[in-house]
Amino acid sequence: MLHCAGCDFLLHFNPTVGVGGFVTDGVGRLLWGRRAKHPARGKLALPGGFVDFGETAEEALRREIREEVNLAVGPLQFLCSQPNEYFYHGITYPVLDLFFVASALDITGLHALDGVESVHWIAPGDLDLDDIAFPSVRRAVEVFRNTRAAGARTEGR
């Protein structure tokens, strides 16, 4: 929070909203991009980014997936939210990341675009959490794994 002693104005440094997509390929793998830019250049990241003014979280995620990997996805299912910090140009921004799960509709045009060095399909169990760019994403991976494991247990009953 920033305070102006002259006029008593308070500026609350509230979180901005980010989105990330657990995009599946139909055989259980997740879509990951290797970041081409800082912060966390070279680390794995889910397709996603910041919500623009006037967008819903769902609209932002669909836009980011198109911009980053040229992919359309089916219906989005909310997974979880996680607090995060984004360090950029000397400033640490508080972020609230919203994570969704969706299936890829057609992967024929899939390729790395804006800010993405390369794309990879990786099974959730094969992920090295230390290779993932942001703490919020690592925590969301755990939620995804636990949710899928719980779903598998209930389907077998």
Q: Model regions: which residues?
A:
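Conserved hydrophobic "DFG−1" position in protein kinase catalytic cores
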Residues: 23-24, 32, 102, 121
